[in-house]
Amino acid sequence: MTDSSYDAQAVRSWLQGLQTHIADTLGAFDGTPFATDAWQRAPGEKLRGGGYTRILEGGKFFERAGIGFSDVAGDALPGSASAARPQLAGRGFEAMGVSLVLHPHNPHCPTVHMNVRLLIATKPGEEPVFWFGGGMDLTPYYGYEEDARHFHRTCRDALQPYGADLYPSFKRWCDEYFFLKHRNEARGIGGIFFDDFSAPGFDQSFAMLKSVGDAFLKAYLPIVEKRRNIPYGQAERDFQAYRRGRYVEFNLVFDRGTLFGLQSGGRTESILMSMPPVVNWRYNWHPEPGTPEARLYSDFLVPREWV
C-alpha cells in the first residue's frame, strides 16, 4: 500500500462496464431484465457520490439477484476499513466497487457472492494510499463435488498469471473469512478473498482485479446451467431457507463490506440487497444422519483442497 500512483477513472470505467455485462448476461439467462435504481447522495449527507443498483426479484430462475456499483467518498475512513491500518484512521477516503449476490429459487443451485473494489485513503499534505480487495465465494445448499471443483479451478486459473502463490493464499483467506465463529461453521465452500492488495503496483494489482471480475460468469454459470432443472420439493426449500439464515447472520455480524457501508452512512437499501428474500431459523435443528442435508455439513462445510 505504499505506491501512491493510481488511475481511479480507469477502475471506475471498468467497474461500470463489468456491472452492465453481468446484469445483461444474467438477465438473459433468467429471461427477466434487471431493473436499474440510480442513486445519488444528497448535499450535506455523511457521504458524497452515488451509484447504480441493478436488481431482479421474483424472476424465473433468480428469486433475488442484486448487482451494485457504488462510488462514494467521505471525510473519515470507517473503523471496519482502518482496523488493520491504524495509521490511516481518520483519513478521507474514496471507495468504489461492484458487489453482487445471487439467490436462485432452486435449492440445488448455489447462492454466490462476488465483489471487486478499490479504496483510496487521502490526507492533505500526504500521498494518497490505495488498495484493492475482493473475491468470490459459493454457498451451496446441496453439495456437488464437481461444482466445487469447477468454481475453485476457475478462481485458480484467474489468479495464475499473477503468481502461483495467490490462489492458495486467497483460498485460505476465504476459508478463514467466511466462517461463522459463533456457529463454528463455514458459510459455504469458499473460493477466494483478498484485501489490502497493492504490493505489485497499480497496473499489476488492477490487472489481477480485472481477471477476478471477468472470471465470475465462467465460474458460476456452468454450475447453474447444469442444476437449474433438477426437481425439488418443499423439504428442499425449507432446508434452503434454514441455511440462508446463516447467510444473514454472517452478513450482519462479520461482513466487512456490510459493516463498512453501514458505519460510513452508506445507502441501506443497496447494502442490504444481498439479503435472501425468504429465510427461517429453527431452534437447535440438526439434519438426519445419512441425508443429503447432513452431507452438506460433513463433506462441504469443511476446509478442503478442491483443486
From Swiss-Prot:
Cofactor(s) listed: a divalent metal cation
First-tier enzyme category under EC: oxidoreductase
Active-site feature positions: 113 (proton donor)
Region (Important for dimerization) location: 247-282
UniProt KW Signal keyword: no
Protein's GO biological process: protoporphyrinogen IX biosynthetic process
Principal localisation: cytoplasm
Key words of the record: Cytoplasm, Heme biosynthesis, Metal-binding, Oxidoreductase, Porphyrin biosynthesis
Enzyme Commission designation: 1.3.3.3
Pathway where this protein functions: Porphyrin-containing compound metabolism; protoporphyrin-IX biosynthesis; protoporphyrinogen-IX from coproporphyrinogen-III (O2 route): step 1/1
GO molecular function, one term: protein homodimerization activity
Positions marked as site (Important for dimerization): 182
Residue sites binding a divalent metal cation per the record: 103, 113, 152, 182
Cell compartments where the protein resides: Cytoplasm
Annotated substrate binding sites: 99, 115-117, 265-267
Catalytic activity line of the entry: coproporphyrinogen III + O2 + 2 H(+) = protoporphyrinogen IX + 2 CO2 + 2 H2O
Classification via PROSITE patterns: COPROGEN_OXIDASE
This protein's GO CC annotations: cytoplasm
InterPro entries xrefs: Coprogen_oxidase_aer (IPR001260), Coprogen_oxidase_aer_sf (IPR036406), Coprogen_oxidase_CS (IPR018375)
Family: Belongs to the aerobic coproporphyrinogen-III oxidase family.
Assembly, per entry: Homodimer.
Cited function: Involved in the heme biosynthesis. Catalyzes the aerobic oxidative decarboxylation of propionate groups of rings A and B of coproporphyrinogen-III to yield the vinyl groups in protoporphyrinogen-IX.
Full protein name: Oxygen-dependent coproporphyrinogen-III oxidase
Species assigned in the record: Paraburkholderia phytofirmans (strain DSM 17436 / LMG 22146 / PsJN)
